[in-house]
Structure formats: C-alpha cells, structure tokens
UniProtKB/Swiss-Prot annotation:
The protein's enzyme class: transferase
Cofactor note text: A monovalent cation. Ammonium or potassium.
Annotated positions binding K(+): 125
UniProt source species: Frankia casuarinae (strain DSM 45818 / CECT 9043 / HFP020203 / CcI3)
Pfam families: Pan_kinase (PF03309)
Entry's EC annotation: 2.7.1.33
Protein name per the record: Type III pantothenate kinase
Length: 250
C-alpha cells in the first residue's frame, strides 16, 4: 500500500492507497516542532495494520519535512520513497517566471486535475490560503492566484475587532445576517464564494475558454454549495497527485 503525505501550513493530510483506491485518509494538525520520534508514534497509530510498501510526500513546511524524512527512515525500511522537490519527475511543465516558486502541493494538484479532467482547468484549493492554480490543455502549470484563506480572514477579524469572535464556518440561514455570528458567517462563506466566482470568471475570460473549476482543500465542501462557478469537488486531489508522481518515479 502507498502512504501519501501532504504537509500543509495548518494541516497534514495523510492517505493510504491500495492501487488506485484511496483506502483511508486522515487530517492532522501540522506541527513543525514535532520530532521524528513523535511522528513515528503518530503514523504507527494511524496506519495500524496497513502494510506500507511505498511513501510519497509533498510539503510546504521545510521544518516539518526535515523531521518527516527522519521518521520515514526509522519507520519504513527498504521501501521506495518519493519526496516532491526540485528534480523529482512530475511530468508537469512549470511555465512561470521562476519555477522554483511553485509549491509542491500546487504541482500535485495540477498533475491530478489534468489526469482526472484534462484541461484547461482551474484548481481552487481552500487551505491556509485560497489558491487558484491554472492548468493548460496540455497539463502545464501556467500560474495562479493567492488570496487569504477563510480561517486566516476569520482569525484576523476576531483578533483585530473587539466585538467579533471566531464562529463555526457554516452557511447562515440568509445572506443578511440577523446576528453577529450570522453576519460573520455570511461574510466568510458567501464572501469567499463570491470572491472565487469572480476570479474564476476572470480566468475563464483571460483563457477564452470555459475551463473546468475543481474545488479541493479542507473547506471546499462548505464553499462549493454556495458557488456559481465551481464544477467539481475532489477533496483528495493532492493525495491523488502524490500517487501519480510516485508511479512516475518508481
């Protein structure tokens, strides 16, 4: 079985593949201070009886990746390991000014999106930041957009405005909030949906094509219900990319 690990700034998504089938997945908090020993205990607890025969990793957190490398050496002996970094074969041409700036997770999303849907495509990843990544008809990564993530925006409001606080991220009963909680929820959910819809429309106009828009990331399931432009929901898009890149390198 393939262990796929996507280390993000806030959360780490872990999946186990049996062939092309995602047999299980977990979302845990990313801790850049965690030691290799702590990670060994964590992953042994998650995996239980699963017999891992390969590991595929991407990370946007260098400190976390260093400990993860040591964990893999300790916990998994004599099995192939692929870490997505410069020099790794991905099959994705990176057509931006400085290809080294493209995060490994964005390249995995590009790879998976083109594999599943072809192109052109727009991947909207609702994570710590909201990323829109653009995939050409040939599967090239041609650029993207960064915007503050929903939780970052909510944290900023709660910390900077004395009368506001963090709320559950669900759609309120109406766009016009009847309470502080509903007003915040409306701004977060409908506001982000409107922002994404506006950006997707602008991207489609610039590409002059109706590119498929794919939502992924932890909060995608909330926003896609309120969006007018998001076409598909693939919650494990990055993990699928990790499976594909493993196959290309082993």
């Amino acid at each position: 079985m393939l262990l796929a690990i996507d280390v993000g700034n806030t959360n780490t998504v872990v999946g186990v593949f049996e062939g092309e089938h995602l047999a299980d997945s977990w979302r845990v908090r990313t801790d850049p201070q965690a030691t290799a020993d702590e990670l060994v205990l964590l992953y042994r607890g998650l995996l239980g009886e699963y017999q891992v025969t390969g590991v595929s990793i991407c990370s946007t957190v260098p400190a976390a990746l260093r400990a993860l490398r040591r964990m893999v050496v300790r916990a998994f002996h004599d099995i192939p390991v692929v870490i997505v970094e410069p020099g790794t074969r991905t099959g994705v041409p990176i057509l931006i000014d400085n290809p080294k700036e493209a995060g490994a997770d964005r390249i995995m999303n590009t790879l998976a999106a083109h594999h599943l849907y072809g192109g052109p495509a727009i991947v909207v990843d609702f994570g710590t930041s909201t990323n829109l990544d653009i995939v050409s008809a040939r599967g090239e990564f041609i650029g993207g957009i960064f915007a503050p993530g929903i939780e970052i925006a909510l944290d900023a409001l709660a910390s900077r405005a004395a009368q506001l606080r963090k709320v559950e991220l669900v759609a309120p009963r109406s766009v016009i909030g009847k309470s502080t909680v509903e007003a915040l929820q409306s701004g977060m959910i409908y506001g982000v949906a409107g922002q994404v819809d506006g950006l997707v429309r602008r991207i489609r106009a610039e590409l002059d094509t109706d590119a498929v828009a794919i939502a992924t990331g932890g909060l995608a399931s909330v926003v896609i219900k309120e969006s007018e432009t998001l076409d598909r929901h693939e919650p494990h898009l990055t993990l699928i990319g990790l499976r594909l890149v493993f196959e290309k390198n082993i």
